[in-house]
Design a protein with these regions (language model features):
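N-terminal beta1-alpha1-beta2 submodule of the flavodoxin-like/Rossmannoid cofactor-binding fold
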Residues: 1-103, 158-198
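Short, glycine-/small-residue-rich phosphate/pyrophosphate-handling segment
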Residues: 104-148, 166
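Amphipathic, positively biased hydrophobic alpha-helical segments used for protein targeting
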Residues: 91, 129-130, 150, 183
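Short alpha-helical linear motifs
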Residues: 109-112, 153-155, 192
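Ligand-binding pocket scaffold of soluble enzyme catalytic domains
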Residues: 4-7, 115-118, 144-149, 154-158
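A short beta-to-alpha transition loop/helix N-cap that caps and shapes the active-site region
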Residues: 13, 122-123, 153
Length: 198
């Protein structure tokens, strides 16, 4: 299986707790036989908004749609909210949602979704809830317990956190198992693509 992680950290990778958690997730996926691509949003040039812009993000989204089995949002908590970088990814996928409605085909029916939140404050459930609502509306399947909360601060401490490692192992297993089930079942072939609200 192949998974794409959109890393919404506000800091550069070498300074980012969120990126450190993304690396642990990628390493665990590799251990379980899956591939991972981490896209760090603050390191690419792209437009914010809901249009089909020709920028560095567009080929990444197209690569995801064509070649990946699952998507993961990774974000720090900032004042109880997810980062603006992840908001910009959600905005850009709005175009995919509009295309899906117009063409009566949801490419994400064959994909799973999970989310990773890092930070020491409250807000995990609120952020996961927003992400999971977005994902189900775009046709993703959400495996049980497909979320990670990383409260530990500092890269060295994150790497040593045994409880976090257990949580990541479970997260990756759930994502991999359900991605394989969905790929085999091919819901894009059989699921309802026509909107009933039109």
């Amino acid at each position: 299986m192949r998974f794409m992680i959109f890393n919404g950290s506000l800091k550069k990778s070498e300074l980012s707790n969120t990126y450190a958690v993304c690396e642990l997730v990628a390493a665990e996926f590799k251990k379980q036989g899956s591939e991972t691509r981490i896209v760090t949003m603050n390191e690419i040039n792209y437009e914010c908004g809901t249009n089909d812009y020709n920028d560095e993000l567009k080929p990444i989204i197209l690569d995801f749609l064509k070649n990946y089995n699952g998507m993961i949002f990774a974000t720090p908590i900032w004042w109880g909210l997810h980062s603006g970088y992840i908001s910009s990814v959600i905005e850009r996928f709005d175009y995919i949602d509009s295309w899906s409605r117009d063409n009566k085909f949801y490419p994400n029916y064959n994909k799973v979704f999970g989310s990773v939140v890092s930070g020491g404050g409250d807000g995990f459930q609120h952020i996961h809830g927003n992400f999971l609502n977005f994902a189900t509306q775009l046709g993703f399947t959400i495996p049980p317990r497909a979320t990670v909360e990383a409260k530990t601060q500092g890269k060295e401490n994150i790497i040593k956190d045994a409880e976090l490692a257990q949580e990541i192992e479970r997260f990756c297993r759930q994502m991999t198992v359900y991605a394989a089930l969905i790929k085999g079942g091919n819901p894009s072939q059989f699921a309802q693509h026509q909107q009933t609200d039109k």
